Amino acid sequence: MSIVEEPYLQLIRDILEKGHEKSDRTGTGTKSLFGYQMRFNLAEGFPLLTTKKVPFGLIKSELLWFLRGDTNIRFLLEHNNHIWDEWAFKNWVESDEYHGPDMTNFGLRAQEDDNFNKVYQDEKKKFCQKIVEDQEFANKFGNLGDVYGAQWRHWQTRNGETIDQIKDVIETIKNNPDSRRMIVTAWNPEDVPLSALPPCHTLFQFYVNDGKLSCQLYQRSADVFLGVPFNIASYALLTHMIARETGLEVGEFVHTLGDAHIYLNHLDQVNEQLQRKPNDAPTLWLNPEKKNIMDFEMEDIKVKNYHSHSAIKAPVAV
């Protein structure tokens, strides 16, 4: 069994066994636990799940999008990444400029009505095409507000200046590795009402010991089946990339969850996943010629020996 994957599978088991049923913003309903922690030793393998196929290309393009300080889905769409489509699409169909079919509560309706789902998928496809082809439209409706990229790279101060938290934390790791202030936060209370989706992975901290870089993430809200596998791999990748720039080896990724939940319409999927036997964890390859985290492109990041079971589809709660 892959040691790297086991903490995640145990999280699923614990929620199924001990979770509390709760209502939620999306109207779907969840089983939930509060205050849960997983630890992944990054030296033992890269924590990309093997009990279902996780598309690593989406993970690395999203992380590069964050690191660019970008908040517009156009970059993602140009890399065939549709993770954030629904939130930008929601802004579009709720605007005065939208005159197409009624898209009220499109997330739930698409799950319950096959005919509506076809209309919804068609409208969303047209929206995404227009984002890519029309810069003015993309500027207006492709922007998600002050989400991760903005907060990481362009945190707005009260005097009108900006803070590049990623640059600052890398400099601190290099020059003062024993600091307890190596923190990046995406949670800005002033900006929360203005974001398409307030940051779920809210704050992360680095720790250096014995030449190894570890990272701990606090995630306020954790969609365990769909979101958490991406979050684990994304922050593991970020830790590897920053370790490369700072001349360190990788240590642990510690994942602390606030509200860790499985949506009620994902229960069949998680039970199917638990029936599968994990394979050995893959390894991460970073282009050895790239030293600066901002210089990485898609082709500079790969996973090797990734052998997974098939994907398991599930609806996104919006």
Swiss-Prot record:
Metabolic or biological pathway, per its Swiss-Prot or TrEMBL entry: Pyrimidine metabolism; dTTP biosynthesis
Domain of life from the UniProt record: Bacteria
SUPFAM superfamilies in UniProt: Thymidylate synthase/dCMP hydroxymethylase
Gene3D superfamilies: Thymidylate synthase/dCMP hydroxymethylase domain
UniProt: (6R)-5,10-methylene-5,6,7,8-tetrahydrofolate binding residues: D223, A317
Enzyme superclass (EC): transferase
EC number annotated for this UniProt entry: 2.1.1.45
Subunit annotation: Homodimer.
Described purpose of this protein according to its UniProt entry: Catalyzes the reductive methylation of 2'-deoxyuridine-5'-monophosphate (dUMP) to 2'-deoxythymidine-5'-monophosphate (dTMP) while utilizing 5,10-methylenetetrahydrofolate (mTHF) as the methyl donor and reductant in the reaction, yielding dihydrofolate (DHF) as a by-product. This enzymatic reaction provides an intracellular de novo source of dTMP, an essential precursor for DNA biosynthesis.
Name of the protein: Thymidylate synthase
